[in-house]
From Swiss-Prot:
Organism field: Gemmatimonas aurantiaca (strain DSM 14586 / JCM 11422 / NBRC 100505 / T-27)
Gene Ontology cellular-component terms listed: cytosol
Gene3D superfamilies associated with the record: Diaminopimelate Epimerase, Chain A, domain 1
Quaternary structure (record): Homodimer.
MF term (GO), any: diaminopimelate epimerase activity
Role of this protein: Catalyzes the stereoinversion of LL-2,6-diaminopimelate (L,L-DAP) to meso-diaminopimelate (meso-DAP), a precursor of L-lysine and an essential component of the bacterial peptidoglycan.
Keywords: Amino-acid biosynthesis, Cytoplasm, Isomerase, Lysine biosynthesis
Domain of life from the UniProt record: Bacteria
Protein's name in the database: Diaminopimelate epimerase
Length: 277
C-alpha cells in the first residue's frame, strides 16, 4: 500500500489516498498503532485517510491518533490534507471543502495552506484549576474543534510538560473526554511560544494546530493579544499564524466567539510502500 509521510510544523502524519487504499484496512486500531509506531512502523503522531466526496464536501478527512482512537479534528493534519489533496488532484489549491468530525472546513493554499475552522463559542477564560498546579499564572479553556486547556506561564520552555500533562489532560473540569493541554508564554518580538501535551498521543508533540487556535482565542479573551493575527512559535521552531474574526449577528450585533483561520506548514517528507500490516 502506498503512503505519504507529511509534517505540519513537526506534527507528523501518515496519509493514505482513499481512492486506492481500503479505508477499513488501515483504520483498525491495531493497524493504526503499528503504522504510527516510531520503532517498528513508519512513525507518526496520527494517521489520515482522505476520501473524495461528491456533494457536501470535496474530501472527507478520516483522522486517527497514534493510539488508534478517532478524533474529530486535527489542525495540522487538516493543513496537510489541504496540501496533499491539491497535489493528488482531488481538489483545487484555490479552494476546497473538507468534511471533518468538527464540521465543514473551507481551505485553500496561498503560499501556505490556510484553513477556516468552525466558529469558536465555548470559551472559558478562567477554569477551576489552581494555576500553580498547572505550572502557570492563569488557566483557560476553549473548544477549537476539540477541547483545550490553555495555561499562561512565564516560560513555556521551562515547563515539565511530561510531568504535568497527564493529570491536567484528564482533569475533571475538562469533562469525561479530557483535553489537550497547552502552555504559552510571550516572546520578545511580540509573538508567543507554546507547547502542547496531546490526548490520543499521550505525550508532547512538536506542534498542535487546534492548540494554537485555542491559545490565540484565550490570549484575546485575556486581553493579551489585540491584533488580527497571532503568531505562535512551535517546538519545531516553525511559526503558525491564527487570524480571529469576532462573530457578529446578521443585524451587526456583536456575538460571543470568533471565526478562526489557521495558517501553517503542510509538507511532504517522503513517500513509500507498506509491505504488510
Amino acid at each position: 500500500m502506498s503512503f505519504v509521510k507529511m509534517t505540519g510544523s513537526g506534527n507528523d502524519f501518515v496519509f493514505f489516498d482513499g481512492r486506492t487504499t481500503p479505508i477499513d484496512l488501515v483504520t483498525q486500531p491495531e493497524a493504526i498503532k503499528a503504522i504510527c509506531n516510531r520503532y517498528n512502523g513508519i512513525g507518526a503522531d496520527g494517521l489520515v485517510v482522505l476520501e473524495p466526496l461528491q456533494e457536501e464536501a470535496d474530501v472527507r478527512v478520516h483522522y486517527y491518533n497514534s493510539d488508534g482512537t478517532a478524533a474529530d479534528l486535527c489542525g495540522n493534519a487538516t493543513l496537510c490534507s489541504t496540501a496533499i489533496s491539491a497535489q493528488w488532484g482531488i481538489t483545487s489549491a484555490s479552494g476546497m471543502r473538507l468534511a471533518t468530525g468538527a464540521g465543514l472546513i473551507n481551505s485553500r493554499i496561498d503560499g501556505l495552506p490556510a484553513i477556516a475552522l468552525q466558529p469558536i463559542t465555548d470559551i472559558r477564560p478562567d477554569m477551576p484549576i489552581a494555576p500553580a498546579t498547572a505550572q502557570g499564572r492563569r488557566v483557560g479553556f476553549a473548544v477549537a474543534g476539540i477541547p483545550h486547556l490553555v495555561i499562561l506561564c512565564e516560560d513555556a520552555d521551562a515547563v515539565d510538560v511530561a510531568g504535568a500533562g497527564p493529570a491536567l489532560r484528564r482533569h475533571e473540569a475538562t469533562g469525561p473526554a479530557g483535553a489537550n493541554v497547552n502552555w504559552v508564554s510571550p516572546r520578545p518580538d511580540g509573538s508567543w511560544r507554546y507547547r502542547t501535551f496531546e490526548r490520543g498521543v499521550e505525550g508532547e508533540t512538536l506542534a498542535c494546530g487546534t492548540g494554537a487556535v485555542a491559545t490565540a482565542v484565550l490570549l484575546r479573551s485575556w486581553g493579551l493579544s489585540d491584533g488580527a493575527t497571532t503568531t505562535i512559535r512551535t517546538s519545531s521552531g516553525r511559526d503558525v499564524e491564527v487570524d480571529l474574526e469576532p462573530l457578529t449577528a446578521p443585524d451587526g450585533r456583536s456575538l460571543e466567539g470568533f471565526r478562526p483561520t489557521l495558517r501553517g506548514e503542510g509538507r511532504v517528507v517522503f513517500r513509500g510502500e507498506i509491505a504488510g500490516l
